[in-house]
């Protein structure tokens, strides 16, 4: 019987690159134990040639964050007619965008913290107007996070005192989600 060939995508260009590389190495090690023919590749300009030459039975997507979990790499794999793990293009896109996800939750009557979206137009002009807007709709403490990032990258729980300082740390993102903080035990799946 022919060994199944699995191409693992790892690394990438997101802020979660190191996490992705760790995931790819772990998956590689476990699949090798099961006697699969496995290679790891970056999702770079050589990817399509690697797919054509290696001819994987399936691509294991170990990419994290932007370009890995947001539907981008999934669309590349679809155009190459390659089977891959994890969700499809549209589901990945919707799940990665926290604002779209929240709209889906609200539409389906799933409880979710109140929120507002903050758009960085000029990082030098962050002022106390945003605090007034938050106080109108939300209560402190709040959670601030990039709309399109995963693995809890750049997530801050803020009180009134440290809010502006933490918001300025996220000035390289265009869109920020600001949610009411809900205390309790945190569980990861």
What is the predicted function of each stretch?
Residues 1-90, 94-96, 100, 119-129:
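ATP-binding N-terminal substructure of ATP-dependent carboxylate-amine bond-forming enzymes
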Residues 105-106, 134-155, 173-183:
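ATP-grasp fold ATP-binding core
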Residues 118, 155-160:
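Short beta-strand-to-turn element immediately C-terminal to the catalytic PLP-Schiff-base lysine
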Residues 159-189:
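Phosphate-binding site of ATP-dependent enzymes
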């Amino acid at each position: 019987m022919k060994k199944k060939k699995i191409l693992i995508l790892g690394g990438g260009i997101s802020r979660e690159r190191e996490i992705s590389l760790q995931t790819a190495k772990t998956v590689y090690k476990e699949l090798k134990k099961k006697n699969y023919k496995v290679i790891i590749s970056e999702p770079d300009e050589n990817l399509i040639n690697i797919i054509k030459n290696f001819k994987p039975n399936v691509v294991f997507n170990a990419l994290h964050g932007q370009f890995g979990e947001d539907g981008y790499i999934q669309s590349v794999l679809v155009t190459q007619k390659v089977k891959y793990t994890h969700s499809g293009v549209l589901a990945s896109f919707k799940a990665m965008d926290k604002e779209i996800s929240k709209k889906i939750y609200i539409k389906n009557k799933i409880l979710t913290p109140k929120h507002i979206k903050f758009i960085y137009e000029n990082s030098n002009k962050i002022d106390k107007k945003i605090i007034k807007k938050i106080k109108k709709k939300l209560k402190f403490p709040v959670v601030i996070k990039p709309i399109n990032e995963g693995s809890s990258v750049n997530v801050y729980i803020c009180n009134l005192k440290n809010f502006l300082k933490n918001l300025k740390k996220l000035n390289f993102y265009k869109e920020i989600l600001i949610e009411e903080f809900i205390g309790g035990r945190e569980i990861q799946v």
